[in-house]
UniProtKB/Swiss-Prot annotation:
One of its GO terms (molecular function) is ATP binding. This is Asparagine--tRNA ligase. The lineage of its organism: Bacteria, Pseudomonadati, Thermodesulfobacteriota, Desulfobulbia, Desulfobulbales. SUPFAM superfamilies: Class II aaRS and biotin synthetases (SSF55681), Nucleic acid-binding proteins (SSF50249). The gene is asnS. One of its GO terms (biological process) is asparaginyl-tRNA aminoacylation. Pfam families: tRNA-synt_2, tRNA_anti-codon. It is an enzyme of class 6 (ligase). It comes from Desulfotalea psychrophila (strain LSv54 / DSM 12343). Coiled coil: none annotated. Homodimer.
Length: 449
């Protein structure tokens, strides 16, 4: 059975027989020896394999290996005298599993731009940067689940196909399959924009729940910050107010950041050196300080008083743009910032109305380099007020009767938030374009495989 390189690198070199399988990164020949750099994807670090002319296929195959070829190596793991590596494998056999023609294989031994790699998204995981993103993304996902499980939350699998538009913005992809009455599900259905409403169903029965899954927006935004398909982390907590919501969100973010810094050292060093210099120090600073907090009204006043010229004019009642959010986090507070109590007119119907009748108990967490990372609120638990806001938003109360029933039978204060997973991966890795942090980006005009 093959052993992962990441495990062999920390093993004691007691001249044990091992099997390594992976892809050739480089080959160099010296006299009667070939030095193969093999990577199996378990770590950024390659395993050096030393093959000599005593191998039966040395001249015919080993000396013809090139970048991208796949091999199975058996040999003895030994302590390496070479600088920068702890162990190496002295091969007793090298089996070529698959060839890669160096004339046509697009990933040769040189640095490729991230824009070029997007054009070959089926091969880009074989590069250092994108494989490192994949491992960090996996670890972040693991840490998210660990956090909520340790907190006693129950994971709920909310539907991908739904007849409800949580955001009420009409940006849903429609499901086209039809039945005898014209609609397969008996009503117009689309791909979910959020699992929040369904998560509220289970929060008002199980207490604390979370959902973590794909969401979809038919928004024609071809920017470095938007995707048509992305993943969302959405907890919902019964008997919880906005204060509790903010505390859980900040605690969760710090938990997953600490986890990645501990377990993805090699990959994070790559990002720190080649992608975003100082990213590790910036993340450590996030862990060391409380998030700043300010109301929307105070934030607008600070922007107006700054003298800064923005592309989008600032006034009370606007939806803060990325340039406003980044100015606040990067220039004013220089750390993550929680903005609360937004105007009701720019927020969805389900957010709890504040006593002033103008703002809602909402919060956004803004982070340097990204802008909005988390959006949450205390939900409106009062039947009459919720029904009034739904009517004002043009929603059919009969169609959303199930949602109103949660307030009709045993209503409780509850709160939750949504965290865009790809933006979290961006924040951690320092990647400038969101297309680099999801395995298969879906954007307007682009869905290659």
């Amino acid at each position: 059975m093959r052993q992962r390189i990441t495990e062999l690198l920390v093993a004691k070199a007691e001249e044990q027989v091992v099997t390594v399988a992976g892809w050739i990164r480089t080959r160099r020949d010296t006299g009667d020896f070939s030095f193969l750099e093999v990577n199996d994807g378990s770590t950024l670090i390659n395993m050096q394999v030393i093959a000599d002319k005593s191998l039966g296929n040395y001249e015919e195959e080993v000396k013809k290996l090139s970048t991208g070829c796949s091999v199975m190596v058996e040999g003895v793991l030994k302590e390496s005298p070479a600088k920068g590596q702890s162990v190496e494998v002295h091969a007793s056999s090298v089996t070529v599993v698959g060839w890669a023609d160096p004339e046509t294989y697009p990933l040769q031994k040189k640095r490729h731009s991230l824009e070029f790699l997007r054009e070959i998204s089926h091969l880009r995981p074989r590069t250092n940067a994108i494989s490192a993103v994949a491992r960090v993304r996996s670890r972040l996902s693991y840490a998210v689940h660990n956090f909520f499980q340790e907190k006693g939350f129950t994971q709920v699998h909310t539907p991908i196909i739904t007849t409800s538009d949580c955001e009420g913005a009409g940006e849903m992809f429609q499901v086209a399959a039809t039945g005898k009455d014209g609609h397969f599900f008996g009503a117009p259905a689309g791909l979910t924009v959020s699992g929040q409403l369904q998560a509220e169903v289970y929060a008002t029965a199980l207490g604390d729940v979370y959902t973590f899954g794909p969401t979809f927006r038919a928004e024609n935004s071809n920017t470095s910050r938007h995707l048509a398909e992305f993943w969302m982390i959405e907890p919902e907590m019964a008997f919880c107010d906005l204060q509790g919501d903010m505390e859980v969100a900040e605690e969760m973010l710090k938990y997953v950041l600490a986890d990645v810094l501990e377990h993805c050292v090699t990959d994070m060093n790559l990002f720190d050196k080649f992608i975003s210099k100082g990213i590790i120090e910036r993340l450590q600073s996030v862990l060391a300080h409380d998030f700043a907090r300010v109301t929307y009204t105070e934030a607008v006043d600070q922007l107006l008083a700054s003298g800064q010229k923005f592309d989008f004019a600032v006034k009370w009642g606007i939806d803060l743009q990325s340039e406003h959010e980044r100015y606040l986090t990067e220039q004013v507070y220089k750390r993550p910032l929680i903005v609360t109590d937004y105007p009701a007119a720019i927020k969805p119907f389900y957010m709890r109305m504040n006593e002033d009748g103008k703002t809602v108990a909402a919060m956004d967490i803004l982070v340097p380099g990204i802008g909005e990372l988390v959006g949450g609120s205390q939900r409106e638990e009062r039947y009459d007020l919720l029904a009034e806001r739904m009517e004002a938003a043009g929603l059919d109360l009969e169609e959303y009767g199930w949602y109103l029933d949660l307030r009709k039978y045993g209503t409780v204060p509850h709160a939750g938030f949504g965290l865009g997973f790809e933006r979290l991966v961006q924040f951690v890795t320092g990647m400038a374009n969101i297309r680099e942090v999801i395995p298969f980006p879906r954007t307007p005009g682009f869905a290659p495989c």
